């Protein structure tokens, strides 16, 4: 069977992290999201895997996924339905959205054995944010209702389908949606009127990485469930390690450092002297956390450096960021209300009382910079010394206030 991973989306909701990488390459501990998907497909015996990408990101995917077929979605039409039109299969195929993390392959291995079309559903606590599955009295799909104000159930579309080539007939029958996209779910709703579409409920951990703080959520789950304590690096005397801590190859932990797990320290990272890593610190690879730096519940990506006298809490920092001395990220409002973040032009609540900042790749801050809760700083931005960053900063912007 063929499998198609739909990864042509712009990743706008995950900005500024996606200013410099497709969302399929958001890291989960040491591996990008898409590598977990490919691994699970191969465990189910699927070898013919194609990733549907945008023309903008094709070169990035080809460089990173050398053994996987890469196909470009046409630029004139957006949406998951348009991505399927770029896929070519004559019999049947497995379709997976490229921004999903799921904890095991069991239901995928199950769904590909079915004779009929099928969709995987998953139960969530916030169904009105997703497409909700409506079932008939035989537990087959009746229809998918997108983001209903009053959801009929908490079983939602998990973004994993097994479809035969009839789907192309139904894609030809639908129109562009109100948001300007050709929607795969519209075609599936038509298909469900004519053919049985079986619903399989997913029972493991599932996460749609659709908002910047979901990067923290999924990494926390992975740290709790996918790895075990190990030390493959070099730890100097007078280092205190407490709880579950993973130290990868060529990492160096210098004297006076206190590490309170669970913590993940990626390959080639340098910690200390006298650093404090608190629970759910994830350092992806070749990071530097220097003297008198405290990090808590944050994902810090490849090559980023926080050399001295800084605090980072509940934040996501993309690759090759460098903080000047005394850079502080605040993660709690004075009124202790939930932190709001601008996502795709709308200011929404994160549902978190503690949330720091989201820093794009290659950002530089001067000394004594303060960044307020929920702020996003675009890739390649420069923050001048002494600035208090109280609003979002754009891609490449120089912020002086």
UniProtKB/Swiss-Prot annotation:
Pathway(s) per entry: Nucleotide-sugar biosynthesis; UDP-N-acetyl-alpha-D-glucosamine biosynthesis; N-acetyl-alpha-D-glucosamine 1-phosphate from alpha-D-glucosamine 6-phosphate (route II): step 2/2; Nucleotide-sugar biosynthesis; UDP-N-acetyl-alpha-D-glucosamine biosynthesis; UDP-N-acetyl-alpha-D-glucosamine from N-acetyl-alpha-D-glucosamine 1-phosphate: step 1/1
Outcome, altering residue 311 to A: Strong decrease in GalN-1-P AcTase activity and increase in GlcN-1-P AcTase activity
CDD domains: LbH_G1P_TT_C_like (cd05636), NTP_transferase (cd04181)
Residue span of region Nucleotidylyltransferase: 1-220
Species annotation: Sulfurisphaera tokodaii (strain DSM 16993 / JCM 10545 / NBRC 100140 / 7) (Sulfolobus tokodaii)
EC number: 2.7.7.24, 2.7.7.9, 2.7.7.83, 2.7.7.23
Temperature curve summary: Optimum temperature is 95 degrees Celsius for glucose-1-phosphate thymidylyltransferase activity.
Protein family membership: In the N-terminal section; belongs to the N-acetylglucosamine-1-phosphate uridyltransferase family.
pH-activity dependence text: Optimum pH is 8.5 for glucose-1-phosphate thymidylyltransferase activity.
SS bond partners: none
Subunit details: Homotrimer.
Protein name: Bifunctional sugar-1-phosphate nucleotidylyltransferase/acetyltransferase
Function: Bifunctional enzyme involved in the synthesis of UDP-N-acetylglucosamine (UDP-GlcNAc) and UDP-N-acetylgalactosamine (UDP-GalNAc). It has multiple amino-sugar-1-phosphate acetyltransferase activities, including glucosamine-1-phosphate (GlcN-1-P) acetyltransferase and galactosamine-1-phosphate (GalN-1-P) acetyltransferase activities, and multiple sugar-1-phosphate nucleotidylyltransferase activities, including N-acetylglucosamine-1-phosphate (GlcNAc-1-P) uridyltransferase and N-acetylgalactosamine-1-phosphate (GalNAc-1-P) uridyltransferase activities.
SUPFAM superfamilies: Nucleotide-diphospho-sugar transferases, Trimeric LpxA-like enzymes
Pfam families registered for this protein in UniProt: Hexapep, NTP_transferase
